[in-house]
């Protein structure tokens, strides 16, 4: 079963993350980053994460300005989405990877 957590990502920005714990001995840690206009709970992402967690620790997350807020299934943050940039997404990834390096799963 996955568990959710949040990481601050700057002023009025949050990374909403899900951890899928490995179901045995972890071979590795996999971070799944959705593409443009995607989000972690959309389409196949939850199913892929669950399947990979049979042998790996898996983290999925929403970029802070992807348009998905507290309602994890609907596009509700249009103003943030309008301000999204590749630089912002790289910064989000740095924040997540830094957190994971300091808090091993």
Tell me what each language-model feature is.
Residues 1-25:
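N-terminal cap/lid segment of alpha/beta-hydrolase-fold proteins
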Residues 34, 75-82:
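A short, mixed-charge helix-start or loop-turn motif at secondary-structure junctions
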Residues 79-104:
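Alpha/beta-hydrolase active-site loop
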């Amino acid at each position: 079963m996955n568990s959710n957590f949040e990481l601050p990502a700057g002023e009025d920005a949050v990374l909403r993350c899900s951890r899928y714990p490995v179901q045995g001995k972890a071979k590795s840690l996999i971070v799944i980053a959705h593409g443009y206009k995607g989000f972690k709970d959309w389409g196949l992402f939850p199913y892929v994460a669950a399947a990979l967690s049979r042998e790996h620790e898996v983290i999925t997350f929403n970029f802070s300005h992807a348009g998905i807020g507290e309602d994890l299934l609907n596009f509700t943050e249009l103003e943030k989405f309008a301000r999204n940039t590749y630089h912002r997404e790289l910064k989000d990834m740095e924040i997540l990877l830094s957190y994971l390096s300091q808090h091993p799963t």
